[in-house]
């Protein structure tokens, strides 16, 4: 049985509220779970203390038992100091896209032509 620490959605339409639960990976998102270990309210301000509540002792115990957190829950656990999340490296994100590179090359070519024309006169 593969265990996941994940979010189970609750709340009304357009008013999400999540429980942080330990559940079997095969069970539905909002379905049966083994234990509730916290809550997440995305409608609160990012610096609000009640935005994420987490029972750290229960979370640590489930991590030791082999439960795998989802990406979002891993962020919460990292913020709580229970899990070290490795930084993702995406070197292509910093460089401009294909069209922007083409435009920059065109601008550089026009600037070079203009400087050649100015120096020739």
Curated annotation (Swiss-Prot):
GO terms for molecular function: structural constituent of ribosome. Residues 111-121 have a biased composition (Low complexity). InterPro entries: Ribosomal_bS16, Ribosomal_bS16_CS, Ribosomal_bS16_dom_sf. The keyword Ion transport does not apply. One of its GO terms (biological process) is translation. One of its GO terms (cellular component) is small ribosomal subunit. Pfam families: Ribosomal_S16. Transmembrane segments: none annotated. Keywords: Ribonucleoprotein, Ribosomal protein. Residues 85-110 have a biased composition (Basic and acidic residues). Residues 85-121 are annotated as: Disordered. Belongs to the bacterial ribosomal protein bS16 family. This is Small ribosomal subunit protein bS16. It comes from Azorhizobium caulinodans (strain ATCC 43989 / DSM 5975 / JCM 20966 / LMG 6465 / NBRC 14845 / NCIMB 13405 / ORS 571). The gene is rpsP.
